[in-house]
Amino acid sequence: MKKGLPNTIGTIPTGLQQSAQGWPRQRTTLGQWVRYIFNPNGVASVNERRWMQPLQGCVASSPSPRVARSSQPWAEGFNPAGVRTARLNRHGFVATSIAILLASSLPLHAADFVEQWGMYEVTLKGPTNGNPFLDVRFAARFAQGYDSIEVPGFYDGDGNYRVRFSPEIQGAWSYETLSNAKELNGKTGDFTATKPSADNHGPVRVANMYHFAYADGKPYKQLGTTCYVWNLQGDELEEQTLKTLAASPFNKIRFCVFPKRYQWNTNEPPMYPFVGRPRNFDTTRFNPSYFQHLEKRVLDLQRLRIEADIILLHPYDDGAWGFDRMTAVEDDRYLKYVVARLAAFRNVWWSLANEYDFMKFKTEDDWERIGQLVSGNDPFHRLLGIHNGKVLFNQTRPWITHASIQNGAAVAEFGRAEIYRDAFRKPIVYDEVKYEGDIESRWGHISAEEMVFRFWNATIAGTYCGHGETYKSDDQILWWSKGGVLKGQSPARLAFLKKVLDDSPAEGIEFVDKWQDTPIGGHAPDYYLVYLGKEAPTSWEFKLPKPPQGKGQPPAEGMKFTAEVLDTWNMTVTPVDGVFTLKKKDNYYHADKDSRSIALPGRPYIAIRIKRINQ
């Protein structure tokens, strides 16, 4: 405490000492205090309110700070997305408090906390006149040391302007808002990004060129499903879908922002993304409630550790609402708004479109513009793909992170799935390979056995696959579109596959011999997965091919292995007795030194898992 400090303060108030325990301490500058006191629309963290309360006792005449309340019903300091928020109106301090505070050099802490890869949200009150969606520009620059990143904000209705930030790095961060509206410009604050909790592994990213991993390095083995508009079916059905997902093996779900008009899906959504009514929407005015609900469902998925693969545009409108034929200006405004709202959610992936080539009002140049816009406006660089109908998009474009492909034929036979890897040099996700079901359309009536077969084909090729289900239902609720409950037999078998994937090498499974033994994948020479598919042999000669150059080390004489027989349909694991020791057979294979074979049950859908014994 500086000498000569007025006796009205004395020592640091007890409440302030307690609130600061364990927090990083920083010296509050004169400029910061001036901003805190005079700025009627400033921002503050939840903890700022906590430590500012004891200051009321410093001067008897100091009124309580007036906290700006939100009209929303959730608890102060949190919004429906469960994120830390910052909101405070500080102009309640009188001049006496100002003099005391300016005379002090207390190392006060004004920071809030958010997990690394979590979401920190700044909310300010701002203009409501005119059209805030068009008239007001709002963003914030977040900084740590010499590094900074500018994040676009958005208008959320009722005078609320928000900007959301997901810190990549732990430690102290600061921010300053940027706006053409005086009351929103130049507001500053700080917070601390803390160690992530046990279930927070960060966003999923590309790893080892063809695979995925969370930001903390934990492997992510994609096992997705499709449920196009489950999020627009009302709370009862949506909660049922979430309950089903919680018990499923799926760790990614594809779904749309816009409503869908298609067979078995002709009901109107509970609300619309824009102000107005069908065929008479004002696309310059968004409906914040619509997007708040979308965010709620994204967070629900995050709690289930499921990635949200969000389809931004689609052709299933047919003029019902006109969202498939918006102008370039309307598209761009909408896309910027969605990215500003959702990019900070760590489980978000972007899909520019479902069956992009079926959108007859868009050209290839439009998609290039849209891809660059979404990529360029996303400060957190979430995964981004574009899904095809009959014509593959140019998946080599630099803004595409992974190839999202519809092609059932690619996984219907051995040796096909890996070809796209060579062409695109990116992770290959067969998001649509037809659907398990019994509807008349040829894309919607493959068997559960065929669905599981296609997943395994994708797996041994070093690629990934997507599930869907279209069983007829009197209530018109088909999983592929509306969600609800799963009726098919493939999910249980895919859960078995998930256990196999979880036990596989972290680097990902690679094809081992695409020229000859295409049913073998793995990570040579330590792990092999042999999938025999629809064949039903009674034995398999134990022999391991050498991998392609650069795809692992070749097997060598003396290496020892164990083996297990996996029944991928009946979901059983049977260990094989003994140890297999390698001896060179020819220029391409090493086989068991005693020429042993593995006995098999003579049924289809059998796999063999082979693991090297470390010596």
Segments (PLM) and residue ranges:
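Aromatic- and carboxylate-lined catalytic core of secreted/periplasmic carbohydrate-active enzymes
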Residues: 132, 218, 436-439, 451-577, ...
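Non-catalytic, glycine-rich low-complexity segments
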Residues: 110-146, 151-154, 190-196, 513-521
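N-terminal basic, low-structured, amphipathic or hydrophobic segments
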Residues: 1-4, 8-9, 14-17, 21-22, ...
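Active-site mouth of glycoside hydrolases
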Residues: 196-414
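Aromatic sugar-binding surface patches on proteins
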Residues: 121, 156-164, 588-592
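Extracellular glycoside hydrolase catalytic/binding regions
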Residues: 333, 354-481, 485-492
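Surface-exposed loop/edge segments in extracytoplasmic proteins
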Residues: 145-152, 570-578
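Extended acidic/polar, glycine-enriched regions
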Residues: 141-209
